[in-house]
Amino acid sequence: MLENDIRLAVKAALDEDLGHQDPNSSLSLSQRFDADITAMLIPAEKIAQASLITREEGVFCGKAWAEQVFNQLGGEVALHWHVDDGDLVVPNQLLCELEGPARAILTGERTAMNFIQTLSGVASLTKRYVDKLSGTHTRLLDTRKTIPGLRTAQKYAVTCGGGQNHRIGLFDAFLIKENHIMACGSIDKAVKAARKLHADKPVEVEVESIDELTQALDAQSDIVMLDNFDVTMMLEAVELNNRYKAKGLGVKLEVSGDVTIDTISNFAKTGVDYISVGALTKHVRALDLSLRLK
C-alpha cells in the first residue's frame, strides 16, 4: 500500500506543480519540463550539483518520496544520501547531495522538499511526545486526522518518530463510537455485530464514563478508548480493568482527548496501554530545509 501511495502522491504533486492535472494526459517528459518556464532559462545540457541541508534539529523522514520525485522526472538525477528515515538531525547537517541535469533538479526540488519537510515535521513531533512516555509502558498512537491523500505517508512518519499506528482506515479495525452505539442499540449489541461481521478484526469501543467502560468490558471488546477522561477517571478505569484481568478478561486501554505535550506524561503514569494524539498528523509544522546548487 505504501509503495503505491508514494507513487500516486508524487505524481499528483508534480502534476499540481507543472499544471497537468488531466488524469488522461500522456505528456512526454520533455513536455513536462517545458511547463517549468523558469527552469527553461537554463540550457538543457547543463549538469549541476546541489546540497540539501536542514536548518533545525529533528527526525528525518521522506527519503522514498524524494527519490520518487526525481524518478518520475526522468531518473537522471542521482541522490547521494547521508541520512536514513528515523535519523536524528541537527542544524546545518547535510542530508543529501544531488547531481544531474540542472533543469530536473530545479523542477523537482520544491516537490521533494515539501514531502521531506512535512514528513520530517510529523516524525519530529512524534519523537517529542514519545520522549514524554519514557519510563512507562504506554505507547503513542496516531489517528485518522491526517492530511487528505497523505494518510499512509504520515502514518509512516509517525513510526519513524517512534510512535505506533492506530487503524489505517475504516477497513482494518472496528472503532465503535457514540453514534454507532446509538444506532446499534447498545455497546453489547454493537460488539456482537462486529464479531459476527468480521471475527478477525480488532474491536475497539469508545466510552465516556465508567459505566460505559463496564459495558465494554462485559461485552469483551479488545480495546476501550477512554474519551476525555480526567486523571482520576483514568486511574479508576485502570483499576476496574485490572479486576477484570484477574478473572481472565480485561482489555487494552487507550486514552484520547485533551492530550498535549504537557499532559501526556501524567496520563501515561495512570497505567493505560495507549495514548492517541491527533496533533501528530493534524498540527503539522514543517522541518526547515534548504537546497542550494553548488
Spans of features found by a protein language model:
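Active-site loop ensemble at the mouth of alpha/beta enzyme cores that anchors a bound cofactor
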Residues: 290-294
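Acidic/glycine-rich phosphate/pyrophosphate-binding loops and surrounding catalytic core
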Residues: 1-219, 223, 235-240, 252-254, ...
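Alpha-helix termini
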Residues: 242-248
